[in-house]
Amino acid sequence: MNQERLMQVLLAPQISEKATYVADKYEQVIFRVASDATKPEIKAAVELLFKVEVEGVQVANVKGKVKRFKGATGRRKGWKKAYVSLKPGQEINFVEGGNA
């Protein structure tokens, strides 16, 4: 896999109450990823950027919500979410910027 492509796969960490719960209970980290990203690309990108070992990757396509603004109906953009399972003993800490 091209290293340039791997840098474009991960868009942002998904930081929310649910993401924190999943991280504590299941040792998983949630990322927003490119819509055309595959599981092997996501795994390689996380291992390259954060220097951790990945056990598995699950993905989910999130549909955009229908919203109204001043009477006009529009739709938010859909996106892809990746649940990355880390091997035991591995950790990614976004607050301190890097792995712990």
Swiss-Prot record:
Keywords: Ribonucleoprotein, Ribosomal protein, RNA-binding, rRNA-binding. It comes from the Bacteria. One of its GO terms (biological process) is translation. GO terms for cellular component: ribonucleoprotein complex; ribosome. GO terms for molecular function: rRNA binding; structural constituent of ribosome. Pfam families: Ribosomal_L23. Belongs to the universal ribosomal protein uL23 family. One of the early assembly proteins it binds 23S rRNA. One of the proteins that surrounds the polypeptide exit tunnel on the outside of the ribosome. Forms the main docking site for trigger factor binding to the ribosome. Part of the 50S ribosomal subunit. Contacts protein L29, and trigger factor when it is bound to the ribosome. HAMAP family: Ribosomal_uL23_B (MF_01369_B). This is Large ribosomal subunit protein uL23. The lineage of its organism: Bacteria, Pseudomonadati, Pseudomonadota, Betaproteobacteria, Rhodocyclales.
